[in-house]
Amino acid sequence: MRKIVIAVVVIAAAASFFLLKRDRPYDRSFETRVANPAYRDSGPVVLYDEGHRNAHTTSAGYKPLADMIRSDGYILRTTSQPFTAQQLGGVSVLVLVLAQGANPTNDSAAYSDSETSAIADWVRGGGSLLLVTDHWPFGLAARSLARRFDVDLSGGFAEDPKYHEPDRGESHLVFSEENGLLREHPITRGRSDAERVRRVLTFTGQSMTGPPGAVPFLLLSDSATDRPPGPARVEREGGNERVLMEYGDPQPAGGRAQGIAMEFGGGRVVVLGEAGMLRAQRDRTGLVGMNMPGYDNRQLALNIMHWLSRAL
């Protein structure tokens, strides 16, 4: 079993992984202006959660996405409050990205039982949810909420030795029309041929399954694997803290997914098993996310929002 060092910081224990991850630099040259906005006046209200130790916020890791959503005509608001039926009133799309539990190893739920009930009831009544998760520890923190929609999150680390970006390695997964892993759905079709999504790149993440009727628009191949998370622990020495986890041997992940879309009562749900696909990051490894040339991650993000807001 291999050991992963998640974080080393001089700060409060519960925030260690969060603080390291949220400050990822974004690509300031990324084009966030939308040439053909879905809404030209007062668009639907999008509520973005920033109250559950979220690793990507609208001012840091997901700022390019937030700016693009605004340019597309949506009214984007953020919240740091617990979710209630009253708070969700008037909201069209709820966006939950990389929430974390209070436990430093993140094997605790990010959302309380009352919050998951409020969110599920709101979606059933016609709301739309975008739930963005990732590999450990984010899969475990979101698992209880995902289960309310009959979505099973592995919480592990996905790889594909066959369908991946050659220059990046097996953890950079390629979904395309050509390899048959980018499945037909309004999200991949768009409103016109110009909006059609043909190639998507993800960056490790985890695998998932959905209920009958859910569409796995990012389908994992028969060669894909998922390394399950194992025991995690916190080591402290002086003011330093490390969160370590041992993960198991690769397990078959063929037929599972990294992107699922479904109807839930009167509402709609999209669950993503990887968060980097909707970032626009520039760091020492190069470009990551919507700014990757040769891939349609940018259009995928717009199409997801269009489908959730029923513009598509």
Please identify what each model-predicted range represents.
Residues 1-11:
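N-terminal Sec-pathway targeting helices
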